[in-house]
Amino acid sequence: MSELIRVPDIGNGEGEVIELLVKPGDKVEADQSLLTLESDKASMEIPSPKAGVVKSIKAKVGDTLKEGDEILELEVEGGEQPAEAKAEAAPAQPEAPKAEAPAPAPSESKPAAPAAASVQDIKVPDIGSAGKANVIEVMVKAGDTVEADQSLITLESDKASMEIPSPASGVVESVSIKVGDEVGTGDLILKLKVEGAAPAAEEQPAAAPAQAAAPAAEQKPAAAAPAPAKADTPAPVGAPSRDGAKVHAGPAVRMLAREFGVELSEVKASGPKGRILKEDVQVFVKEQLQRAKSGGAGATGGAGIPPIPEVDFSKFGEVEEVAMTRLMQVGAANLHRSWLNVPHVTQFDQSDITDMEAFRVAQKAAAEKAGVKLTVLPILLKACAHLLKELPDFNSSLAPSGKALIRKKYVHIGFAVDTPDGLLVPVIRDVDRKSLLQLAAEAADLADKARNKKLSADAMQGACFTISSLGHIGGTGFTPIVNAPEVAILGVSKATMQPVWDGKAFQPRLMLPLSLSYDHRVINGAAAARFTKRLGELLADIRTLLL
């Protein structure tokens, strides 16, 4: 029987087909990867939900696919008709399955043991569109007693660190992962012995032997069959693959290669069956840097930028090398990419917030009564949301073609949070529809999650504009880097009391420094000046937000 295999739920957005891993006539197993999709956030391999033979392929390299699009047509194995045909052709064979059929009967008495019935598989929950994440900490071990919602492991993706809690109380029987492993949604974390879960567990062992026995028997020969063909691949280990369609690498390796601007077909594979590992990419980058260095002062890197000479700092004194967290590494790569791709200009201005501050202080008691702390941030969020609707170019992104603007009808604003592991930017959605107290509560909650590694990847996506405030630390101004594909970011520094001429005398006024960095391809200087001028007017008299 033929079935159409479609793209499963891949989170928000769509992905480009960068690699086809099968061809018509290939025999595939359940969960075997069919193709690799690359979105603007990650690359992911799409597995086959069933075993069978590839009849035809509906997608090709370069296609853009989304959830529900056709991948291929699969001739599914193991249907009822082939079983009947075997029964007619060889009467002796059906006796074997029948002989196996009573086997589950004794096994039905075995699951009655409460120990086996109470074991649950604890798996990685939905971690959003991040796809994969590295295990950076395992907090339990076999034999430990855990409570519901107690943290089991800490995962770190390219967007955030998060702790995965236990969904139930129980005793850890075995831990299936270790520090350094890369896991995704649905991967097994550990086995947990839970009391009172026997009925649900009994049904699974009873049904599993009958269903799993045949596929298990089929999968092993199938996996063994292609092994000799692929066994030729490790032989030339160290030789780069020149055929881009046959590069074998996981999503994390592809992401690392993109960050470094490395063409995977040029990388020497050292992994099993010719698979490219992270270490292979790192070695390749080091070789290129050494080659550029030995090429003399005129040598340049892959992007045409002369590399910074390598310096042995230890000859000047004692040094210590401290590893950057993955979050810091990815953040640095993203900032570098934005800086190289976006023509930055920064507009500086000041806003008189004397009256606004008086209003904020006057509402302090009301805010505390509502259980929130009213800071300057919610007022900035509200004012910026007003301006994003008034000046829609600031609420847009440059189309990939570079010939159009994509204007957004929603107003989601990110705000930078300083954490021990690096800078995180949670996003508040529909800022224009929320009150100051609602914004204050949501900002406090997101900032707390960011600092405690509870922030999901989805909570940091979809922003139209970003606010980065250093006012609590100090400074008179800075040049924030635009978080592309956004086109602007507002930097806020420390407010100070300054003398301001009112036409008759100098008056003490509380002045807030503003730094608006913008993408000059989308925003011109006059528009940026209008933005900061209007923002100053709104902050000077926040009653104008009601107009």
Swiss-Prot record:
Report the cofactors: (R)-lipoate
For region Disordered, the annotated ranges are 75-117, 202-248
Q: What induces it?
A: Induced by glucose.
Ranges of compositional bias, category Low complexity: 80-117, 202-231
Q: Which reaction does it catalyse?
A: N(6)-[(R)-dihydrolipoyl]-L-lysyl-[protein] + acetyl-CoA = N(6)-[(R)-S(8)-acetyldihydrolipoyl]-L-lysyl-[protein] + CoA
- GO biological process annotation, one example: pyruvate decarboxylation to acetyl-CoA
Q: Output the Pfam families linked to this UniProt entry.
A: 2-oxoacid_dh, Biotin_lipoyl, E3_binding
The protein's Enzyme Commission number:
2.3.1.12
Q: Which InterPro entries match?
A: 2-oxoA_DH_lipoyl-BS (IPR003016), 2-oxoacid_DH_actylTfrase (IPR001078), 2-oxoacid_DH_E2_comp (IPR050743), AcTrfase_Pyrv_DH_cplx (IPR006256), Biotin_lipoyl (IPR000089), CAT-like_dom_sf (IPR023213), E3-bd_dom_sf (IPR036625), PSBD (IPR004167)
Phenotype reported upon loss of the gene: Disruption inactivates the pyruvate dehydrogenase complex and causes an increase in pyruvate concentration and acidity of the culture medium.
Where's the Peripheral subunit-binding (PSBD) domain?
248-285
Q: How does it assemble?
A: Forms a 24-polypeptide structural core with octahedral symmetry.
Q: Which PANTHER family match?
A: DIHYDROLIPOAMIDE ACETYLTRANSFERASE COMPONENT OF PYRUVATE DEHYDROGENASE COMPLEX, DIHYDROLIPOYLLYSINE-RESIDUE ACETYLTRANSFERASE COMPONENT OF PYRUVATE DEHYDROGENASE COMPLEX
Free-text function comment from the UniProt entry: The pyruvate dehydrogenase complex catalyzes the overall conversion of pyruvate to acetyl-CoA and CO(2). It contains multiple copies of three enzymatic components: pyruvate dehydrogenase (E1), dihydrolipoamide acetyltransferase (E2) and lipoamide dehydrogenase (E3).
- This chain's protein is named Dihydrolipoyllysine-residue acetyltransferase component of pyruvate dehydrogenase complex
- Organism the protein comes from: Pseudomonas aeruginosa (strain ATCC 15692 / DSM 22644 / CIP 104116 / JCM 14847 / LMG 12228 / 1C / PRS 101 / PAO1)
Q: Which gene encodes it?
A: aceF
